[in-house]
UniProtKB/Swiss-Prot annotation:
Record protein name field: UvrABC system protein C
GO-annotated biological processes: nucleotide-excision repair; SOS response
Extent of the signal sequence: none
GO cellular component: cytoplasm; excinuclease repair complex
Organism: Shewanella baltica (strain OS195)
Classification via NCBIfam families: PRK00558.1-5 (NF001824), uvrC (TIGR00194)
Top-rank lineage group of the source organism: Bacteria
Family: Belongs to the UvrC family.
Record keywords: Cytoplasm, DNA damage, DNA excision, DNA repair, Excision nuclease, SOS response
HAMAP family in UniProt: UvrC
C-alpha cells in the first residue's frame, strides 16, 4: 500500500450508507470504481492484513486516495457505478468495449415500402426488425428477402427517378412498383407477408400463400399459381434451416465461459421465438478477477449502455447464477422503466438455446487461448532474437500506398501480445508532397504519429517500417528528433522485400545500427513480423482505394462548370453512382433535383467527351 495513503484515517470518515467509491493512483487517474450497500464495511475489507486475492493486492498497492459518493439506495449506487465506469474506464474494472450501434432491417412507411439496412438513431418512420449482431447478418437477410419477396430495396431518390424497370425486376428480385408493374394491392400483400416473416411467423406466411395458390389455380391463373408455389417452396426450405422456439417472446440468451483470464459472453438474440443472430463479447478482465464480478459487470454495462440503439428484451437467460442478480434486475428495470428479468434455471426451449450459447462461448475461449499462446510464443522468440531485456508490449508498423503517386495514404497498425489491436489502427492522408515520393510520405506519417508524444504516451517497443534502408533512415531521423528528451524510444526495424517479393526472403534492418539480418522462412518470429507487415499493407491499400475512388468521383464531376459538392451528391445519389451518371441521357439527368435542362446538357457533353 502506498505510504501516502492513510487507510485508518480515511476509514474513520466513511459512512455506513450505500454509495459508490472511486480509487485514484498517484497520477490522479481513476483505477477502480465500486459500489456498496455499506461503504464503510466494503472499503474496510480492502485494508485487511491478509488479502487472498492477488488482484486486490495489486489494486491496493496503487491507491493514492479514495473519493466516495453517497446514494439513497443500492439501486442508485449500481446505476452511478455504471456511469463512472463508462466515464473513467478504470484499469482494474471489468470493461465491456461495445461502442458500435446495432444494425436493423427497416421496412419504411411509403406508398411502396422498401426494405433497407439501418444503423443508428431510428428517425425514419417505419418498422424496425432486429437487432442483428452485425452488418453481415443484415445484408445476408436482405439478400434472402429479395429471393422470397419482390419488395424494392432501392432508396427513395432512385425509386423516383425510374422511367423503366431496373435489373432487379429482370431477375425477379423486385416487382417494379416504381413504374406500375404491380398493383398497389398486390404489392401491399407482399409487404404484409414480408413483415410477418421478419417477425418469425413463417407458418402464417406459408398458409396465406397456400390459400393464394389454390385460389389462383381455381381461377385457372396457372402462371400466378406457379409463382406462389415457388415462393412457398423457398419459404419452407428457409424455415427448415432455422431453429425456432415454441416460446414466441423476445429474449437474450447468454452463454458464459471464463478461463485463464479470458471471458466470453456468447449472446443469442431471440426475437419472436427465432434466432436473429449471435455475437461473442470479450470484456477486458483484470488478472485474478472472480467470476461473480465478471458476470455482474458485463450485465450491468451491456444493458445500461444508453449510447447504443438496441432493443432490450424483458427477459435474459444466462448460464451462471451470481450474487446481486436480483439487485441488478431491480436497477436495470428502474433505469429502463420496464420489467426486466434475469433467469438461470430454465428448461425446454430456453435450456436448448442456453446449451448452444455455452458451447459457442466455450469454443470461442479455447480458440482464443490457442491463438494467444501461439502469438505469445512468437513474441518470446522475437525478444530472444533481438536480445531484448524487457518484454515487447506494443509493436507498430507503417506502410505507404498509392497508385502512381495518386491519393497517397499511410497506415499505422498496432499489435500487442494478443495480436492485432484494431482499435488503435490509424490512417494518414498524405498531402503536400511530390506524387510518388515514398520518403516524403513516410516522413510526414511518422512525424504526425509522434508529433506530441509524451513520456506517458503510447510508445511502441518496436516500430517496423515496410520498406528498405532509405525509408528506415527517414523514420529513424524523425524518431531521434521526437524522442530526444524522453527516456524511452522505439527500436526501429526495416522490413525489406526479398527477391521476387517472396515471403520468407525478407531482409530485416535495425534502425540504430543499420545492421541487416534474415530469419529462417519457418521461424515463428518471422511469421509475426510478416503478419504485422501484411496487416499494415492491407490497411494502407484499403484506405488508398477508398480515397482514390472518392477523389475520382469528386474530381470528375466537380471539374464540370456549375457542379459543386451539393449537385455532385445529388447526381450520385439519384442515379446510383458515377458510371450511371456517365451513362445517363439528358432526359434522365434533368430529373435530378437542382439540374436544369441546360446543366443536364453540359454534364452530358462533358462526360461523353
Amino acid at each position: 500500500m502506498s505510504n501516502e495513503f492513510n487507510a485508518q484515517s480515511f476509514l474513520r470518515t466513511v459512512s455506513s450508507s450505500a454509495g459508490v467509491y472511486r480509487m485514484y493512483d498517484v497520477k490522479n487517474d481513476v483505477i477502480y470504481v465500486g459500489k456498496a450497500k455499506d461503504l464503510k464495511k466494503r472499503l474496510t475489507s480492502y485494508f485487511r492484513k491478509n488479502l487472498a486475492n492477488v488482484k486486490t493486492q495489486a489494486l491496493v498497492s496503487h491507491i493514492h486516495h479514495i473519493d466516495v459518493t453517497l446514494t439513497h439506495s443500492e439501486t442508485d449506487a449500481l446505476l452511478l457505478e455504471n456511469d463512472y465506469i463508462k466515464q473513467y474506464m478504470p484499469k482494474y474494472n471489468v470493461l465491456l468495449r461495445d461502442d458500435k450501434s446495432y444494425p436493423y432491417i427497416l421496412l419504411s412507411q411509403h406508398e411502396h415500402p422498401r426494405l433497407a439496412y439501418h444503423r443508428g438513431p431510428q428517425r425514419e418512420k417505419g418498422h424496425y426488425f432486429g437487432p442483428y449482431p452485425n452488418g453481415g447478418a443484415v445484408r445476408e437477410s436482405l439478400h434472402l428477402m429479395q429471393k422470397l419477396f419482390p419488395i424494392r430495396q432501392c432508396d427513395d431518390l432512385y425509386y423516383k427517378s425510374r422511367s423503366r424497370p431496373c435489373l432487379q425486376y429482370q431477375i425477379s428480385r423486385c416487382s417494379a412498383p416504381c413504374v406500375g408493374k404491380v398493383s398497389n394491392a398486390d404489392y401491399d400483400e407482399q409487404v404484409k407477408l414480408a413483415s410477418l416473416f421478419l417477425k418469425g411467423k413463417d407458418q402464417q406466411v406459408i398458409s396465406a400463400l397456400v390459400d393464394k395458390m389454390e385460389l389462383a389455380a381455381e381461377r385457372q391463373a396457372y402462371e400466378q399459381a406457379a409463382r406462389f408455389r415457388d415462393q412457398i417452396m423457398a419459404l419452407r426450405k428457409v424455415a427448415e434451416q432455422q431453429e425456432v422456439s415454441n416460446n414466441k417472446g423476445d429474449m437474450d440468451v447468454i452463454g458464459v465461459h471464463y478461463s485463464s483470464g479470458i471471458a466470453c459472453f456468447h449472446l443469442l438474440f431471440i426475437r419472436e421465438g427465432k434466432i436473429f443472430g449471435s455475437r461473442s463479447y470479450y470484456p477486458s478482465v483484470p488478472a485474478q478477477t472472480d467470476m461473480d464480478e465478471v458476470l455482474r459487470s458485463f450485465i450491468l454495462q451491456f444493458y445500461l449502455n444508453a449510447d447504443i440503439q438496441r432493443t432490450i428484451p424483458k427477459e435474459v437467460v444466462i448460464s451462471h447464477n451470481f450474487e446481486e442478480l436480483h439487485e441488478l434486475e431491480a436497477a436495470i428495470s428502474e433505469a429502463l422503466d420496464k420489467k426486466f428479468s434475469i433467469k438461470t434455471n430454465v428448461r425446454a426451449d430456453r435450456a436448448s438455446f442456453l446449451r448452444l450459447a455455452v458451447t459457442n462461448a466455450t469454443n470461442a475461449v479455447v480458440t482464443r487461448l490457442s491463438h494467444k499462446n501461439t502469438v505469445e510464443q512468437r513474441f518470446v522468440l522475437l525478444e530472444e532474437i533481438l536480445e531484448l531485456s524487457t518484454p515487447i508490449q506494443r509493436m507498430e508498423c507503417f506502410d505507404i500506398s498509392h497508385t502512381m503517386g495518386e491519393s497517397t495514404v499511410a497506415s499505422c497498425v498496432v499489435f500487442n501480445r494478443e495480436g492485432p489491436h484494431k482499435g488503435e489502427y490509424r490512417r494518414y492522408n498524405i498531402e503536400g508532397i511530390t506524387p510518388g515520393d515514398d520518403y516524403a510520405a513516410m516522413k510526414q506519417a511518422v512525424s504526425r504519429r509522434f508529433d506530441k508524444i509524451e513520456a506517458g504516451g503510447k510508445i511502441p517497443d518496436i516500430l517496423f517500417i515496410d520498406g528498405g534502408l532509405g525509408q528506415l533512415r527517414i523514420a529513424q531521423k524523425i524518431v531521434d528528433e521526437k524522442f530526444v528528451h524522453l527516456d524511452k524510444a522505439p527500436q526501429l526495424i526495416g522490413v525489406a522485400k526479398g527477391e521476387g517479393r517472396k515471403p520468407g526472403l525478407e531482409t530485416l534492418i535495425l534502425g540504430d545500427t543499420e545492421t541487416s539480418f534474415s530469419l529462417e522462412g519457418d521461424s515463428p518470429a518471422l511469421h509475426l513480423i510478416q503478419h504485422i507487415r501484411d496487416e499494415s499493407h492491407r490497411f494502407a491499400i484499403t484506405g488508398h482505394r477508398n480515397r482514390r475512388q472518392k477523389t475520382r468521383n469528386t474530381s470528375t464531376l466537380e471539374s464540370i462548370p456549375g457542379i459543386g459538392p451539393k449537385r455532385r451528391k445529388a447526381l450520385l445519389q439519384h442515379l446510383g453512382g458515377l458510371q450511371e451518371v456517365k451513362g445517363a441521357s439528358v432526359a434522365e439527368l434533368v430529373k435530378v433535383p437542382g439540374i436544369s435542362i441546360e446543366m443536364a446538357q453540359t454534364i452530358h457533353d462533358a462526360l461523353r467527351g
